[in-house]
Regions:
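Generic long, charged, amphipathic alpha-helical segments
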Residues: 270-303
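Glycine-/acidic-rich phosphate or pyrophosphate-binding loops and their flanking alpha/beta elements
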Residues: 9-13, 235-258, 271
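Thiamine diphosphate
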Residues: 36-128, 142-162
């Protein structure tokens, strides 16, 4: 397949991008609002073209453990789900992180808690960036704000996951998953050969250990001293990721007196709110975290002495705002605006919140 421009949903872009970047396998289970990922993969039948395995597992728990096995053999494997489904995967995600294996997870968030609603939400921020499963681990978290980024972040997620031997997650809300936009899809990359996998992943359990010692994939250490050494190594790796992989976008921040800080679809809505505010003479800029972890702490802190206030806008009751407040360390006023239960706000609501909570 050659590079092409297509109109499609964010969920569909995930499926197309996974095939085109040379992924070896997808294991998932349908749940709204991300079901189109699995549906599109089934329609495209990549097992007939690239040899990519696509399997609907019997449950979310089964799917994440299939990913664990595929990742342990050095394969490029991914799964996708939506909020309650990702909760079911948390034990497996922790095991994968503890075994230092690369994989890609996609969460197209819906409203909660509990079964909640199929409408969009951003209420899984804490679960994603603070470690939803047990133990001290981190996920490299990418937050797309367009259908193009949904496609682009598949390849980027795999790249970072293999670079650091750590799971990566694309955290999208239901708006981004369901909206349709023009997407530039890259040309098809071939899947890696078995020889390439062995050469690139010397840690993998491939079943072909000729010329090298066998590998054991595990997160288990019975001796606490050994477990502490493992954990200290993990933490050193996380510090390296924080040093090298922070990504964010700034819009009209040079002369801004106020900042809107938002990710995903709220950053898109916030951009229109910024334009409306500037029409009223209010100098507003947007800072959009692209990596939710590692978080752009230093970038936000740099504005603490430059702006009069920051409004954090999220589709939740206030989660990312905690990291923003930690970043500015009390040097500037930080307030929150959010809608819950699947309600998506208008740009005018954000302007009103800015005027009432920050500017007043």
């Amino acid at each position: 397949m050659v590079e092409e421009v297509v109109l499609m949903k964010g969920n569909e872009a995930i499926a197309h991008a996974a095939i085109r970047c040379g992924a070896d396998g997808y294991f998932g289970y349908p749940i709204t609002p991300q079901s189109e990922v699995l549906e599109t993969l089934a329609e495209l039948k990549p097992w007939e073209t690239t040899g990519m395995v696509v399997l609907q597992a019997e449950s979310e728990v089964a799917a994440i453990n299939m990913v664990y096995g595929g990742a342990g053999s050095g394969k490029m494997v991914l799964t996708s789900s939506s909020s309650p489904g990702v909760s079911l995967k948390q034990e497996g995600i922790s095991y994968i992180a503890g075994a230092e294996l690369p994989c890609l997870i996609v969460n197209v968030m819906r409203g909660g808690p509990g079964l909640g609603t199929i409408q969009p939400s951003q209420a899984d921020y804490f679960q994603t960036v603070k470690g939803g499963g047990h133990g001290d681990y981190k996920l490299i978290a990418l937050a797309p704000a367009s259908v193009q980024e949904m496609a682009d972040f598949v390849a980027l997620g795999f790249e970072l996951a293999f670079k650091y031997r750590n799971p990566a997650i694309i955290l999208a809300d239901g708006v981004i998953g369901q909206m349709m936009e023009k997407v530039v899809l890259p040309a098809q990359k071939p899947r890696r050969t078995e020889e390439e996998v062995i050469a690139q992943c010397p840690w993998a359990a491939t079943g072909k250990a000729k010329g090298r010692k066998p590998n054991i994939i595990t997160s288990l250490e019975l001796k606490p001293e050994a477990m502490e050494i493992n954990n200290l190594r993990f933490q050193a790796k996380y510090r390296e990721i924080e040093k090298n992989e922070v990504r964010f976008e700034e819009i009209n921040c040079e002369d801004a007196e106020y900042l809107i800080i938002a990710f995903g679809s709220m950053a898109r809505i916030g951009q229109k709110a910024m334009e409306l505010a500037r029409e009223k003479g209010i100098k507003v800029g947007i800072l959009r975290p692209i990596t939710l972890w590692p978080f752009p702490t230093k970038a936000i802190a740099a504005y603490a002495d430059k702006v009069k206030g920051m409004l954090v806008t999220e589709l939740n009751a206030g989660q990312m705002i905690e990291d923003v407040r930690l970043a500015v360390n009390g040097k500037v006023k930080v307030e929150h605006f959010g809608r819950l239960g699947g309600i998506v706000p208008d740009p005018d609501e954000i302007v009103t919140a800015l005027e009432e909570k920050i500017i007043k």
